[in-house]
Amino acid sequence: VPYRFATERRDYSDYASGRVFYGLPGFPAMPVRLAGEMFARALAFRAAQSLHSPCTVYDPCCGGAYHLATLGYLHWSDIDAIIGSDVDEEALSLAQRNLDLLTPAGIERRIAEIAQMSAAYGKPSHAEAQASAEVLRKQLLGLVEEHTIRCELFRADATDGQALQTKLRGRPVDIVLTDVPYGRRSGWQVPPTAPASSLTPAGRMLEALLSVISPSTVIAVVADKQQSLAHPAYRRLGRFQLGDRHVVWLAAQEYVIMNK
């Protein structure tokens, strides 16, 4: 059984993509349980280094950021900031709407949108969305009393280390959690002007991340089995396979970071 932390088969219907959280065709939605497992294991690897403070989570291939928004709701106390980037402007627009749902103003705006759709069309799905939105609003109002999660998005090619370094401006990244492009619904968009490399796009992303991470950063990546997630500058902390996908947790070799 691959799940060690998200072992409970709970009902995540209130968090379904397209109900309250925004979704669009062509933007895959990482399963809530899988995202939770990836994050929880990353936290465990941090705890093994005696690191327990709320962390900054970064996704260099954030897409619509559905998984980042649900992580915020379900792991609020463990997250200080969420940063996402993508090369696709449409993805970033969708991501902004989803991350706005981590704010009272954003959830109120979404409730108003759903109410308008319900009044206009009266579909059962709209009634379900209204009920779920009220659940999320109540949950969020309790969470923001604890602290707020800072969210930021920017446009960048995940394989361009210089661009990532410029945009992140030296801010520490504690956990990188990403679902890299694969399959028929999404794909890598490596610019034609990118330097030639023998690495795969996923390998180039890992190479680029070396410019913005520290030896304590935990990288959690999910990809299809055809994409290798090995890189000589990283050591593997853990791995599991789930259907046609595999998930790995990595950390940079300390000597690599020291020599950057």
Put a short name on every predicted segment.
Residues V1-K260:
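Class I S-adenosyl-L-methionine-dependent methyltransferase catalytic core
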